[in-house]
């Protein structure tokens, strides 16, 4: 067995939006604080999530969470609270992350995000919620970047189909599973 160091990915997600409110700073500055902390503890990669609420959920999808803790009544409204970054913001975060000596990635949840992230990410991360979205997997795989897939919320048959799909397109590396 090879003795290799684990590759640690810090899930930034969209968590920094709440930090920005608490500290009364911009979300971009809060995201950079998260990157700073990840670099301080020796993390290998900072990972974000890229989406627009309009592309991932219906405006009428009801909340599935405890409304006493989060009063937002629709999934769309909640996702919209956390989809403020654009391509320029992600480019700035990418450059900042690389300057700190870490890799940068962001899980895209739509085609537009996958496309603009192509020149930034060191690899793509596909969410387990997208493992049955074969056209999207083909789109990402065809970009030729390494691909990490999350399998936590997927059936084994979905994982198998996603892997077989990636094998049919030009990808350079596939890693699974990811552990959240």
Residues covered by each model-derived region:
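Hydrophobic faces of well-ordered beta-strands that scaffold small-molecule active sites
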Residues: 8-10, 46-48, 104-106, 124-126, ...
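Active-site mouth loops of central-metabolism enzymes
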Residues: 10-30, 79-82, 103-105
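Conserved, mostly hydrophobic/aromatic
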Residues: 11, 38, 117, 150
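Catalytic domains of carbohydrate-active enzymes, especially glycoside hydrolases
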Residues: 33-49
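Glycine-rich, proline-tolerant flexible connector loops at the mouths of alpha/beta enzymes
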Residues: 45-84
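Active-site beta->alpha loop and helix N-cap motifs at the rims of alpha/beta catalytic domains
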Residues: 70-133
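Active-site-adjacent beta->alpha loops and helix N-cap segments on the catalytic face
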Residues: 126-144, 155-162
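Conserved small/polar residues in nucleotide/adenosyl-binding loops
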Residues: 172-178
């Amino acid at each position: 067995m090879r003795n290799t160091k684990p590759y640690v990915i810090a899930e930034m997600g969209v968590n920094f939006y709440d930090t920005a409110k608490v500290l009364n700073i911009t979300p971009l500055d809060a995201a950079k604080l998260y990157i700073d902390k990840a670099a301080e503890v020796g993390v290998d990669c900072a990972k974000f999530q890229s989406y627009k609420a309009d592309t991932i959920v219906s405006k009428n999808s009801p909340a599935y969470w405890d409304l006493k803790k989060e009063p937002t009544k629709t999934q769309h409204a909640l996702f919209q609270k956390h989809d403020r970054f654009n391509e320029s913001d992600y480019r700035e975060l990418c450059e900042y992350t690389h300057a700190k000596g870490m890799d940068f990635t962001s899980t895209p949840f739509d085609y537009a995000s996958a496309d603009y992230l192509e020149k930034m990410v060191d690899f793509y991360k596909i969410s387990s919620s997208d493992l049955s979205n074969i056209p999207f997997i083909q789109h990402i795989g065809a970009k030729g970047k390494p691909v990490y897939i999350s399998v936590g919320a997927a059936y084994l048959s979905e994982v198998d189909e996603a892997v077989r799909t990636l094998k049919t397109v030009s990808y350079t590396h596939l890693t699974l599973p990811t552990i959240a």
